[in-house]
Structures are given as structure tokens and as C-alpha cells.
């Protein structure tokens, strides 16, 4: 027998075809060569003559391919009578693949071998079974943990959103859960405690009336002005200016104020009467001309001038009449004289009255003769607003008359009267369901669209009056189901790209959804669609309505009694959300109407004041910046404060002031950023008007019926900013909000020059200038601002007292008699 130690005696070939050799020095197989061949049983053939071969693929890979033989040799090591016999394999096993490290789920359930082939293994193919693989437990746990983590983040975001919508007890429980605190624990709410409810600057005393508004005819005519009104802001400025003067007289108190980091502390109680700070003209009576002929008309040329002035300057902002139909009726009326309905004549006379106001401003004609707007008002009054007609039920034309009367009073700065007639138009419209979707198949599409635009015109006017007066509004996004107006003119309703919006209500509700109610995805889709519409008055009307809904929501949610009862953190969350809505609206403004450049909201108007769509750009810009400063006004109180300083507002209790010291750095940064935005928005609004005052330009290029409101809103915001300025600015980065004093004072002087110029023509502007001029001259000396170039106002005409209402004698006896009469009548 040959020596078997030289080569493997079976001649087994490896995978590459070469004979498999065994290293004699390998300790793992050394036992094979050391066997005692002579001691074997004679009946067993020598190993070299075994007609067996090892399989090419083993079931279990190991450090040595002949594991079964080695195992057998170990078993025989204790008994020389046994020889290791390799396992017999069939020819088919030569091509069998080794078992997969991870079986598919069907093979694992049936407990059979799986080759691990993907996407389908061999066993599943043979058994016609759907093959799929499941991750190992460790991977499954990791994925499940990731999914649970994302769900927790979603739930936390949802709870944060719900926190500002629920009542205070539920909000407190939500905050404790988010902080990981036991909700049943009675512990304090930390730095965000209930004491910080009143910490938003201008929202204190929101639910209070600090004077008797029924004490005289003048106070009754003036009415109430709420916290979001610039009249209330002016009242606060007057009280602070008086406080500053008192400190100036008392040097000790003044030094204490400087040492405390503030220039003044507001008085503990309102000192100035509301009627004294209102620059509107509700205390001036409206003459009733009983001698006017309600059926008389101005000369045709003058009538055309008034009619065109209204249609060009006012109708794009208030689509109160269906333009194509009314223009056709107007032409027919003058070409073929007939007796139209009284309410149609009343609408025409109110259009003449408003157009006459526009013509007076642009032509400089005195308000006399056919240029007297009061004549047209009295004609409309006799036709539809007499004692008998007022008790009749209102139809669409009566709603239009009431609306136009309210708008006329706005242009006359008779805000309280406008508020009354606007409420009448609103109630009449709701009584006819104009605030709801109109789906009557018998009514033509243009007529349906006219009702939609009438409703949104009422909404716009009601919103404007709410912004001016600060009173509770009748309108809100939850009241109306009417879709946004279509951004196309009536002449384009038959086009293939426009007609589906009229025919498919679901498409219209999806495409023309309010920005206030849109999700992020819907807003981004709108950004690409709306700018594709061609510029037109209807597109402008669509944009201004969409913006007004956001601003009205700001007034309803922030400047509300509900907002007063909420925590400062909840109010701040609302401000963040509405700020995002305004950003989204700005991103959707079509290119023809854009008034900003880049991604920010910095004003960037064309240098050519006669550029196309310039009036629309300026009107949208003024409305946008007015919305911005209204939103951020509650944070303006913090501009003069260093981090950690207590709030200077008198309504804040000591416990709230202690809580304000615990305000986080992020909240202070938020307040500062919002205050900066408020001041910048006010300055941008004033930048919309040129440096040189021009009444004609102001009337033709701006919303002239409420331009005084915009100018005073921006001016009062800047004056509030200046009044909260410390006399010595600390070197603190948080005070960068007040760093540009030169630009701020420059815009203030510009506003005063405009008010002074307007004061020669408008009594309301005259009152506004005198109020602002008085406050500026009292607060600027301590700030080192030179006001020598501001007109003094001594050259202005005196107040016209011809129609002023007299004040009732405020003695106890007269008041007792007056109140006794009120109780019985």
C-alpha cells in the first residue's frame, strides 16, 4: 500500500478543477495521517480504495471542508474497529445551492429550506406561492421606532396648534404633557404661567370702556374706538405725552425714569376722552335738503364725468354693481329717457355723489351747485331712505343703495354713520343668503358672479370700518361660504379656460380657495396659477378680497376678548400663523401688481409713477403694510425694553411683571422681530406716497376714500415707537429695532407735511395734523430730533363749527333729566 500522506487518496476535485491537497502540517487534519492503518479490521477496505467522493458543496460551511469526515474520524478515535464512512450524495446534490441566511416568509412558515433568491425564491415558484421577505427583528424594531418617533412629532405639532384653539384649562394640560409633566400635578406652569396673560403690549384693557360715551351728543356721535384703531393708539399717545410732561416738571421723577431704563410710565388710568382724539367728522351734522327734486339729474357731460370717475377709481375695489349691465342701463337711460325704478335712480345718485367727491379733489372745484355731493345724497335719501321705505324689505338694489351710502360716508370721514349703514347692508345681504353659495340653475353665470362680488364688496367695507373703529365685526371667514370672485372680467366668462370655473363648483372651490384656509401644498399650487391670469380689475379685486380675509381674521382673533383671555404664548402663536398667511398671500401677487422685489417684503415700486397698473400696486401695498402693522402692533410695546425688564403697561399686575422676567430669549427675540416688522411696515406704507404732497396724485393713485386712515395708522405707529424710546439707548443688540432713528424721524416729518397739505381741503386731515403735531412737539425734544422743518399749522383755517353738535350740559341735574327720558323712551 502506498503512503497516503502525500496526497488525498480520493482524487476529489475542487470547484476550479484542481485536485484538493491536504497540508500535512495542518493541525485540523493531522489526525487523518496519524491513523494506525495496521490496526484496522481486515474486513474493511483501505481508505485509499474507497469508491466515494465528498460533495462539492457542504450543508454547513466551516473552517475545514471535510467536516463530516473529521467528525467521523473523531468518533472512531476511541474504537479502532470503526472506520469513518462519508455520507453518500446523489448526483443532483452537486448542483444544490446552500441554504440562505434569511428565508422568505412563506418558506419560514412552512419550515422548509429557502435558497433566498429575490424577488422570488425557487420553493415559492414551485408551490406557486407569493414570495416576500420580512426584515429581521432588529431592523423591524428600528423602523418601527422611527415611525413612532415621527408620529410623536406629528402629535406634538398638533397639540401645539390645538393649544391656541382650546380653553385655558385644556391648554395648560397640553403644555404640561409637552413638557413631560404629570397633567394631574398641581405645580405651577413655570415661566409661561397664567400671570403672563396680559403681557402682550397693546391688548390690555381690551374688554373695558373707560368713559361714558352717552354723556353728550358729541361722544354719542363719535362712538367707541377699540384697541386696533389708530384713534385708540392716538389716545394712548396723548396720555403718554402728558405723562412725559409731568416728568419733565419733576426732575426727580424724570431721573428715576431714566435710571429704570424708560423715558416715561403710562398713567394708571385713561385721561383723554375718546371724542377729543377722534379726527373723524361724525360730530358734524348732515344737512337734510327737503327742497331737492329726487328725479332731477345733472347735465349729461357732468353726469358722465361723475359716472366715469366712480367706475374708474372706486368700482375696481368695490364691485357693488354689475358693471356691464349697469353701464348699458345708464346709456339707455340718457339716450331714451324713461322712468326707471326708484331704487335704480337712488343707486345712480349715490354713484354721482361719490364720483362728485372724486371730481372735487382732482379739479379743485368748490362743492356748490351741481358739484355739491350732498344734493345727490339727499335725492337718494328721498327715493329709498325715507320714513316709509326704510320699513320695507330690502332687495338687491336696496342693498346696493345702503352700501353706497355707507361708502359715501366713509369718503366724508363720517365713520359712525358709515358703520350704521354698512351694518344695514350686511344684515340685508344675509337675509337674502348672499353670503352662501348660489347654485340655482335658472340664474345665468354673470348674475351669480355679480351676487358673489356684491357680498365681497360688503365684506371689504365692513372690514375697513372694523379696522378704522376697532369695533366688533359682523364678518369672518366662518360666516361666508361664498367662493372668491373669479379673477376674470365678465367679457371673458365664455373662454374655454374660464368657463369650467363657472360650471364646476368643486373646481372653483379648489382653485379659488382663501389663502387663510389653504394648506401649504394648496398655497404653492396657487402661486403658479394666479400669476398666469392676465391683469384686470377683476384680478385686482380677487387679490384685495383675499388679503382682507386675512386681516379680518387678525382683528377677530388677536384684538378680541377671546385673545385677551388667552396666554401670551397663544397670542404669539396666532401672530406667527397669520404672519405666514401674509407671506403666502404676498408670494401669490401677480407680477403686474407686485410692489416688492426678491423674497422679502421691502417696498419696491417702479420709479415711473405712470407705469401700468400703478394704482393697483399702490393700493395693494398700502393694504398689505396696514395688515402687517396691525398684526405686529401688540409687540410694539416691547421695542424700548431691555431683556428682562418688566412691562410698562399699567394693567399688568405685579405677578405678571415677575412672570415677564422669565420670558425666554426666543420669545423676546420674537417680540423684537415683530416690533421691527411693525415699524418697517409703517415706514413702507408712508413710502408709497411721494415726498412732495399732491392732492390730485393722492386721489387718482390711492384708495382716496380711506387714505387718511392709512396715513394716520402708519404715523401713529411710528409715534408709538418713538414714545417708547429710552432717552439713552443701551448698547444691547436687542435694541437694534430702534437703531435707525434718522429714517424714522424722516418718515414722521413726511407724514406731517402731507397732513398739513391735506388740511387746507379736508377738515378731518386738519384735525389729524393738529393732534400729531402736538404729540410730536412734546415727545421729540428728549430724543434730540430736530423738528424745525415741520409746519406749525398756524396758517390753517379754523375749525368749521357750522354743523357741530352741541354738548349737553354735563351737570347732575341735566344728566338726571336726560337719563330719565331715556329710560321712558
Swiss-Prot record:
Gene3D superfamilies: Zn(2)-C6 fungal-type DNA-binding domain
An example Gene Ontology biological process: positive regulation of metabolic process
Gene null: resulting phenotype: Leads to increased production of ochratoxin A (OTA) in the presence of OTA-inducing carbon sources such as sucrose, glucose and arabinose. Increases the amount of superoxide anion and H(2)O(2), as well as the sensitivity to H(2)O(2), in the presence of sucrose, glucose or arabinose.
Biased composition (Basic and acidic residues): 239-251
S-S pairs: none
Compartments (UniProt record): Nucleus
DNA-binding interval(s): 104-131
Span list, region Disordered: 60-102, 239-267, 642-663, 804-825
Keyword Nucleus attached: yes
Up-regulation conditions: Expression is down-regulated in the presence of ochratoxin A-inducing carbon sources such as sucrose, glucose and arabinose.
Pfam families named in the record: Fungal_trans, Zn_clus
Regions of compositional bias (Low complexity) in chain numbering: 68-79
Domain of life of the organism encoding this protein: Eukaryota
Keywords associated with the record: DNA-binding, Metal-binding, Nucleus, Transcription, Transcription regulation, Zinc
UniProt GO molecular function: DNA binding; DNA-binding transcription factor activity, RNA polymerase II-specific; zinc ion binding
SUPFAM superfamilies: Zn2/Cys6 DNA-binding domain
Recorded GO CC terms: nucleus
InterPro entries tied to this protein: Trans_reg_galc, Transcription_factor_dom_fun, Zn2-C6_fun-type_DNA-bd_sf, Zn2Cys6_DnaBD
Role this protein plays: Transcription factor that negatively regulates the biosynthesis of ochratoxin A (OTA), a mycotoxin composed of a chlorinated type I polyketide dihydroisocoumarin moiety linked to L-phenylalanine, and demonstrated to have nephrotoxic, immunotoxic, genotoxic, neurotoxic, and teratogenic properties. Also regulates cellular redox homeostasis and sensitivity to H(2)O(2). Carbon sources such as sucrose, glucose and arabinose repress gal4, leading to up-regulation of OTA biosynthetic genes and altered cellular redox homeostasis.
Name the record gives this protein: Transcription regulator galc
Amino acid at each position: 500500500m502506498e503512503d497516503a500522506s502525500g496526497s488525498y487518496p480520493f482524487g476529489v476535485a475542487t470547484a476550479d478543477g484542481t485536485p484538493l491537497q491536504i497540508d500535512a502540517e495542518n493541525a485540523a487534519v493531522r489526525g487523518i495521517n496519524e491513523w494506525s492503518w495496521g490496526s484496522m479490521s481486515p474486513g474493511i477496505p483501505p481508505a485509499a480504495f474507497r469508491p466515494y467522493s465528498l460533495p462539492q458543496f457542504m450543508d454547513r460551511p466551516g473552517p475545514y471542508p471535510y467536516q463530516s469526515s473529521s467528525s467521523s474520524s473523531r468518533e472512531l478515535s476511541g474504537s479502532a474497529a470503526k472506520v469513518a464512512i462519508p455520507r453518500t450524495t446523489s448526483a443532483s446534490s452537486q448542483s444544490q445551492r446552500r441554504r440562505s441566511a434569511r428565508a422568505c416568509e412563506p418558506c419560514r412558515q412552512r419550515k422548509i429550506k429557502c435558497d433566498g433568491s429575490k424577488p422570488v425564491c425557487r420553493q415559492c415558484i414551485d408551490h406557486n406561492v407569493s414570495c416576500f421577505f420580512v426584515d429581521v427583528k432588529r431592523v423591524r424594531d428600528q423602523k418601527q421606532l422611527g415611525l413612532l418617533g415621527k408620529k410623536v412629532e406629528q402629535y406634538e405639532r398638533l397639540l401645539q396648534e390645538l393649544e391656541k384653539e382650546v380653553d385655558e384649562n385644556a391648554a395648560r394640560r397640553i403644555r404640561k404633557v409637552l413638557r413631560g409633566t404629570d397633567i394631574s400635578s398641581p405645580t405651577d406652569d413655570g415661566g409661561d404661567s397664567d400671570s403672563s396673560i396680559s403681557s402682550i403690549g397693546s391688548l390690555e384693557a381690551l374688554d373695558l370702556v373707560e368713559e361714558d360715551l352717552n354723556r353728550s351728543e358729541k361722544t354719542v356721535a363719535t362712538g367707541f374706538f377699540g384697541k386696533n384703531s389708530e384713534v385708540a393708539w392716538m389716545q394712548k399717545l396723548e396720555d403718554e405725552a402728558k405723562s412725559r410732561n409731568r416728568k419733565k416738571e419733576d426732575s426727580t421723577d424724570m431721573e428715576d425714569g431714566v435710571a429704570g431704563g424708560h423715558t416715561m410710565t403710562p398713567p394708571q388710568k385713561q385721561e383723554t376722552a375718546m371724542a377729543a382724539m377722534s379726527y373723524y367728522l361724525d360730530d358734524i351734522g348732515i344737512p337734510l335738503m327737503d327742497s331737492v327734486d329726487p328725479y332731477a339729474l345733472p347735465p349729461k357731460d357732468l353726469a358722465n364725468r361723475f359716472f366715469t370717475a366712480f367706475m374708474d377709481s372706486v368700482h375696481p375695489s368695490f364691485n357693488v354693481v354689475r358693471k356691464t349691465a349697469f353701464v348699458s342701463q345708464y346709456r339707455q337711460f340718457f339716450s331714451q329717457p324713461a322712468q326707471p325704478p326708484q331704487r335704480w335712480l337712488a343707486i345712480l345718485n349715490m354713484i354721482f355723489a361719490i364720483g362728485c367727491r372724486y371730481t372735487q379733489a382732482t379739479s379743485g372745484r368748490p362743492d356748490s351747485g351741481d358739484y355739491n355731493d350732498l344734493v345727490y345724497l339727499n335725492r337718494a335719501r328721498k327715493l329709498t331712505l325715507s320714513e316709509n321705505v326704510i320699513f320695507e324689505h330690502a332687495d338687491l338694489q336696496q342693498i346696493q343703495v345702503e352700501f353706497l351710502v355707507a361708502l359715501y360716508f366713509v369718503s366724508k370721514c363720517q365713520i359712525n354713520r358709515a358703520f350704521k349703514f354698512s351694518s344695514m347692508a350686511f344684515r340685508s345681504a344675509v337675509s337674502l343668503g348672499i353670503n352662501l353659495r348660489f347654485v340655482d340653475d335658472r340664474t345665468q353665470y354673470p348674475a351669480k358672479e355679480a351676487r358673489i362680488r356684491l357680498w365681497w364688496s360688503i365684506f371689504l367695507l365692513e372690514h375697513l370700518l372694523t379696522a378704522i373703529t376697532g369695533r366688533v365685526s359682523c364678518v369672518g371667514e366662518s360666516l361666508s361660504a361664498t367662493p372668491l370672485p373669479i379673477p376674470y372680467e365678465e367679457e371673458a366668462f365664455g373662454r374655454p379656460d374660464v368657463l369650467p370655473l363657472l360650471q364646476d363648483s368643486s373646481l372653483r372651490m379648489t382653485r379659488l380657495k382663501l389663502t387663510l384656509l389653504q394648506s401649504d401644498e394648496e398655497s404653492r399650487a396657487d402661486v403658479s396659477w394666479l400669476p398666469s391670469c392676465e391683469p384686470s380689475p377683476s384680478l385686482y379685486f380677487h387679490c384685495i378680497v383675499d388679503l382682507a380675509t386675512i386681516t379680518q381674521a387678525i382683528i377677530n382673533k388677536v384684538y378680541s376678548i377671546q385673545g385677551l383671555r388667552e396666554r401670551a404664548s397663544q397670542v404669539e402663536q396666532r401672530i406667527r400663523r397669520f404672519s405666514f398667511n401674509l407671506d403666502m398671500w404676498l408670494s401669490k401677487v401677480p407680477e403686474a401688481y407686485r410692489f416688492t422685489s426678491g423674497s422679502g417684503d421691502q417696498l419696491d415700486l417702479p420709479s415711473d409713477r405712470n407705469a401700468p397698473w400703478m394704482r393697483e400696486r399702490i393700493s395693494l401695498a398700502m393694504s398689505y403694510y396696514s395688515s402687517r402693522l396691525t398684526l405686529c402692533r401688540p409687540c410694539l410695546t416691547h421695542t424700548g425694553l431691555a431683556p428682562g425688564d418688566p412691562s410698562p403697561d399699567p394693567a399688568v399686575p405685579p405677578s405678571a411683571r415677575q412672570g415677564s422676567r422669565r420670558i425666554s430669549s426666543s420669545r423676546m427675540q420674537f417680540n423684537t422681530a415683530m416690533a421691527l416688522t411693525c415699524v418697517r411696515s409703517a415706514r413702507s406704507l408712508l413710502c408709497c406716497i411721494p415726498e412732495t404732497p399732491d392732492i390730485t396724485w393722492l386721489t387718482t393713485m390711492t384708495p382716496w376714500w380711506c387714505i387718511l386712515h392709512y396715513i394716520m395708522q402708519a404715523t401713529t405707529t411710528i409715534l408709538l415707537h418713538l414714545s417708547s424710546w429710552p432717552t439713552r439707548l443701551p448698547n444691547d443688540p436687542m435694541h437694534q429695532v430702534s437703531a435707525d432713528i434718522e429714517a424714522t424721524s424722516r418718515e414722521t416729518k413726511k407724514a406731517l407735511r402731507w397732513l398739513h397739505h391735506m388740511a387746507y381741503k379736508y377738515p378731518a386731515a386738519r384735525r389729524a395734523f393738529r393732534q400729531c403735531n402736538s404729540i410730536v412737539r412734546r415727545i421729540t425734544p428728549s430724543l434730540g430730533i430736530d423738528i424745525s422743518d415741520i409746519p406749525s399749522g398756524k396758517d390753517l383755517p379754523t375749525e368749521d363749527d357750522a354743523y357741530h353738535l352741541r354738548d349737553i350740559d354735563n351737570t347732575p341735574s341735566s344728566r338726571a333729566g336726560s337719563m330719565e327720558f331715556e329710560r321712558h323712551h
